[in-house]
Structures are given as C-alpha cells and as structure tokens.
Amino acid sequence: MQPLNMAEILDHRGVLTDGDDGPFRNLTNFYDMFSSNFPEGLRVLVFDEDPSYLLILERHLQKFQYQVTICNEVNKAMHTLRNHRNRFDLAMIQVNNAEGDIFRFLSEIGSEMDLPIIIISEDDSVKSVKKWMINGAADYLIKPIRPEDLRIVFKHLVKKMRERRSVVTGEAEKAAGEKSSSVGDSTIRNPNKSKRSSCLEAEVNEEDRHDHNDRACASSAKKRRVVWDEELHQNFLNAVDFLGLERAVPKKILDVMKVDYISRENVASHLQVTFLIYNIIVHFQQHFCFYS
C-alpha cells in the first residue's frame, strides 16, 4: 500500500479558488435561518499548518453535516478572509502565538467583518486567550479540540445574526422616529404661516440639516477605534469592581471610568467580551481538571 500523500488530498478537497462566492447568507433574516435543517450546511473555512490534524478537523465537522473547506497555507487563508468572506459562515484559524499577520489582520479589521473567526491554538494560557478575544476572535479553542466543541460552533453565527438584526432594527426605528418628529415639529411651529414663508423656512431647515449631517459625518470619520490596552482595561476592571456585578452596567461603568474618548457602546461591547472570556476560562479549567 502506498503511503498517504497529504498534499494530494489537500489539493483535491475544499480547494480555495477565485470563483463564485457561494450562496448569500442574510444575517438579518433570523427566523428563516432556522426554517430548514440549520446548522446542517454550515460553511466553515478551516486553516491549520498541520495537514494531519487538518484532516481530523474536517472529518469531525463533516459528521455534523457542515460544508468544510480546508487550507494549510496561511497566505491562502488570509486571501480568502479578505476577498471571499461571503463564501463562509465562520472560519477556524490555527495560530502559534499572538503575533504575526493573522493577529494584525484580526486586530485591524476583525471587528468590521461579518464572519466569526474562531482561534485554534495549543497555547492554553489565559494571557493568550484574553489577547485574541479582546482583539476580535469569536472563540478560542485549545488543541486537541473535543468533537462536542466542534458540534456547536454554529452558535457564533447565531450570535452574529442577532447582533446584525438588532442593529438594523434599531437604525430603522431611529430613522422612523426622526422622520415623525421632524414632520410633527414643522406642523406645530408653522400652523398659520403663508405658503411662501413655509417653503422658505423649509429650505433653510434643509440647508441646516445637510450642514449638520456633514459635520456629523466628518466627526464620525475622525473617530478612532478604541484600543483596550492594559491601562484602559484595568480602569474598566476597577470600575466593575467598585460598582459590583449587580450594578455594573455600561452607563455606570463609564461614569466611574471618567474617560472622555470612549462611549457607552464601547463599554457595553467590552463588558460582553470580558464576560465571554471569563466563561471560556472557567470552561478551560473545568475541562483540564476533568482530564488531568
């Protein structure tokens, strides 16, 4: 019997090509996602430098009826994440340390991606887990990965769908409210004005609105992404400790932190990530105590 040629297997299974981006996954269509056999058909990109372990991951994921594309070249994986995100529902990326191209990529644009990225690593240190999670990873799995952890990776897509649906709904409600308020205010302020006067005021208001929007856009463009360095994160933890878990809500945390360049939304997002990291660490401790 001839020895198994890993290179040939990888060349013929889940090849990354510059073709069709695959079926579009509408992340706002939350209920339609569950109308079929979801999570069967979940599209997963898996990168690992170890061809043997890559095939093990593929085999386990396929048992759960996931559509798996495997890759053992980091450049191909990065190219796909940048240019063909719509071909996948989530990505599982193996890393050796919290450095290099993958870390920079995730730190720079990971928060802007609709694609949940799960980190795979042999490093079980809390420091590594925290660094990746704070910088945009959806989850952190330690090798060797248990099949039951692979079975539920779809939860990260569900979370992403809920977030997108919440954002879209909020923006729609805000727009509808602003339109209703604008019409109501105009009617109350100008019930008896002549048609000419009303038209003139409408033109002035329209110019003011455009000027305000231009300033808002310019201000938004100048906003920088908040980097949660050790000092800022410690300030956050001190605020949570001061308030206590029962009272540690984003607005109160922000008041205690007294940092003018972060928003309530920034704090809310970081609070969610921090609790997620805590749950992962507890899971790791239970897992390794059980198997030790």
Swiss-Prot record:
Compositional bias (Polar residues): 179-191
Chain spans, region Disordered: 168-215
Chief localization:
nucleus
Name the family the entry cites.
Belongs to the ARR-like family.
The Swiss-Prot or TrEMBL record marks DNA binding at 225-275
List the protein's name: Putative two-component response regulator-like APRR4
Output the GO biological process annotations, alphabetical, semicolon-separated.
cytokinin-activated signaling pathway; phosphorelay signal transduction system
Q: Which GO terms describe its molecular function?
A: DNA binding; DNA-binding transcription factor activity
The gene that this protein is the product of is APRR4
Q: Which UniProt keywords apply?
A: DNA-binding, Nucleus, Transcription, Transcription regulation, Two-component regulatory system
The Response regulatory domain is annotated at 43-158
Its subcellular locations are: Nucleus
Source organism of the structure: Arabidopsis thaliana (Mouse-ear cress)
An example GO CC term for this entry is: nucleus
Stored SUPFAM superfamilies: CheY-like, Homeodomain-like
Please explain the role this protein plays, according to its UniProt record.
Transcriptional activator that binds specifically to the DNA sequence 5'-[AG]GATT-3'.
Complex and partners? Binds the target DNA as a monomer.
